[in-house]
Amino acid sequence: MSYAIIETGGKQVRVEPGRFYDIERLDVDVDGNHTIEKVLLISDDNGVTVGQPYIDGATVEGTVVDQRRAKKVLVYKMLPKKKTRKKRGHRQYFTRFMIDSIKVGGNVVAAKADA
């Protein structure tokens, strides 16, 4: 099983071809392709390749499936004995991203199986 660890949105995510992941919002249209170049680690049949901090020439390519918003997070602040109440909500934007392939130096290391 081949996988890669990428950095996107300030977070590190373990990704595999053929699966989708919810990552921080990307400014790409739905059904648009996007390439992530911040690849920290690649594991395949030949072994593990670790970058310092990134692997030169390694990319993860994928397709944007959907642009969504997460569930609402409520923030409630109150001061006792002061009749002060604040109730606010926040919905974070995120992108549902399907991983198509993992490449190193232009060579495909892993790709999703077309069914």
From Swiss-Prot:
Listed GO CC annotations: cytoplasm; ribonucleoprotein complex; ribosome
GO biological process, one term: translation
InterPro entries linked: bL21-like, bL21-like_sf, Ribosomal_bL21, Ribosomal_bL21_CS
GO MF annotation terms: rRNA binding; structural constituent of ribosome
Keywords for the protein's UniProt record, in alphabetical order: Ribonucleoprotein, Ribosomal protein, RNA-binding, rRNA-binding
PROSITE patterns linked to this entry: RIBOSOMAL_L21
UniProt similarity note: Belongs to the bacterial ribosomal protein bL21 family.
NCBIfam families registered for this protein in UniProt: L21
Assembly and oligomerization: Part of the 50S ribosomal subunit. Contacts protein L20.
Summary of the function given for this chain in its UniProt record: This protein binds to 23S rRNA in the presence of protein L20.
Protein name: Large ribosomal subunit protein bL21
Organism: Picosynechococcus sp. (strain ATCC 27264 / PCC 7002 / PR-6) (Agmenellum quadruplicatum)
